[in-house]
């Protein structure tokens, strides 16, 4: 089991015998061993009043139920809207009791600093739906928002024969994904001389 209680030579000999006998680790045994030490994962989502997250939460709960036999415990924390202080308060409250964190982060310096601090403390951080790409987070699960902005502009240009004054309704500037989508739109628009944005609201 690689816990360092036997010599390297003995371990190598045991592994060779196991290989010759076709030994395969028992998943059920692993699950029983994992139960001795639970892994806690906190999930923080701005999901209250936002049906977009219904399927996300359902998927998380299904996965948590499946992996619970392997010692995984998921704790879901929800909030309404995009108040950075509220999200930071939740982060500070749960961070010391978990080994990993899944979060839809608000694009605020206080949140970025908190995520970096958690990574430095050895926590595994996954951003979902919106990224915090300038942080030390381990991975991001979500859309390529900049490319979606480029695509939106290209489609609109095709529909208007590249001559238009456009009004853009943006969701929330506190979300990096929304800002990236706008950046992508303007990036594509740079090559369209008769295409203009009248206002962004």
Task: Cite the ranges covered by each PLM segment.
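Short, well-structured alpha-helical segments in soluble
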Residues: 83-99
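Flexible loop/hinge segments that line or gate small-molecule binding clefts
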Residues: 103-147, 158, 165
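Short, surface-exposed alpha-helical segments at coil->helix boundaries
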Residues: 11, 53-61, 88, 146, ...
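Hydrophobic alpha-helical
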Residues: 94, 99-119, 185, 196-201
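An alpha-beta-alpha
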Residues: 60, 152-195, 199-200
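Amphipathic helical "hinge" segments at domain boundaries
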Residues: 24-86
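Periplasmic-binding protein-like
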Residues: 42-44, 98-105, 124-128, 166-169, ...
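N-terminal helix-turn-helix DNA-binding module of bacterial transcription factors
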Residues: 1-35
């Amino acid at each position: 089991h690689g816990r360092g209680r036997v010599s390297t030579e003995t371990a190598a000999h045991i592994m060779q015998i196991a290989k010759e006998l076709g030994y395969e680790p028992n998943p059920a045994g692993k699950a029983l061993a994992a139960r001795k030490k639970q892994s806690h994962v906190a999930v923080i989502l701005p999901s209250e009043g936002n049906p977009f997250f219904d399927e996300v939460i359902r998927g998380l709960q299904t996965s948590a139920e499946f992996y619970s036999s392997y010692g995984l415990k998921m704790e879901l924390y929800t909030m309404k809207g995009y108040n950075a202080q509220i999200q930071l308060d939740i982060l500070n409250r749960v961070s010391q009791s978990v080994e990993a964190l899944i979060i839809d982060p608000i694009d605020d310096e206080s949140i970025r600093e908190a995520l970096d601090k958690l990574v430095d403390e050895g926590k595994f951080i996954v951003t979902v739906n919106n990224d915090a790409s300038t942080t030390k987070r381990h991975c991001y699960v979500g859309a390529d928002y900049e490319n979606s902005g480029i695509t939106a502009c290209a489609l609109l240009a095709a529909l208007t024969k590249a001559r238009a004054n456009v009004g853009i309704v943006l969701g929330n500037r506190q979300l990096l994904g929304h800002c990236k989508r706008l950046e992508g739109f303007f990036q594509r628009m740079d090559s369209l001389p008769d295409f203009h944005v009248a206002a962004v609201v």
